[in-house]
């Protein structure tokens, strides 16, 4: 009878979450790249979901130099720290993040138009 009660307490998925801590920071979350229309033909590109392990100000500096655009880090009440760049930089950001190894292709979610 005690053997049967032991079966009830066995959880086959108890160890399923082990090993997740071996993944690099931010791999379980998506990086969202959005575009927002401003006045006229002007647009803003926002990048949200980059792990806190990375210095966002240094990333903005690299984006500004590589893409020849202006950018800043803003504090969004819902999304936390968000990188904001002038112009439509969605493809450039995707290529750059994959190139430097910050994200994989399946982690990037591109929104807009």
Swiss-Prot record:
Organism domain of life: Eukaryota
CDD domains in UniProt: eIF1_SUI1
InterPro entries linked to this entry: SUI1, SUI1_dom_sf, SUI1_euk
Entry-annotated residues carrying N-acetylserine: 2
Keyword Ion transport in record: no
Any single GO BP term: positive regulation of mRNA cis splicing, via spliceosome
Keywords recorded for this protein, A-Z: Acetylation, Cytoplasm, Initiation factor, Phosphoprotein, Protein biosynthesis
Disulfide links within the chain: none
Cited SUPFAM superfamilies: eIF1-like
Compartments reported by the entry: Cytoplasm
Residues annotated with Phosphoserine modification: 2, 9
An annotated GO cellular component: cytoplasm
Pfam annotation, one family: SUI1
GO molecular function, one term: translation initiation factor activity
UniProt site (Binds 40S ribosomal subunit): 41, 65
Bilayer-spanning residue ranges: none
Self-association and partners: Component of the 43S pre-initiation complex (43S PIC), which is composed of the 40S ribosomal subunit, EIF1, eIF1A (EIF1AX), eIF3 complex, EIF5 and eIF2-GTP-initiator tRNA complex (eIF2 ternary complex). Interacts with EIF4G1; in specific 5'-UTR length and AUG context. Interacts with EIF5; which in a mutual exclusive interaction associates either with EIF1 or with EIF2S2 on a common binding site. Interacts with RENT2.
Family the UniProt entry places it in: Belongs to the SUI1 family.
Its biological purpose: Component of the 43S pre-initiation complex (43S PIC), which binds to the mRNA cap-proximal region, scans mRNA 5'-untranslated region, and locates the initiation codon. Together with eIF1A (EIF1AX), EIF1 facilitates scanning and is essential for start codon recognition on the basis of AUG nucleotide context and location relative to the 5'-cap.
Protein name (database record): Eukaryotic translation initiation factor 1
Organism ancestry: Eukaryota, Metazoa, Chordata, Craniata, Vertebrata
Gene encoding the protein: Eif1
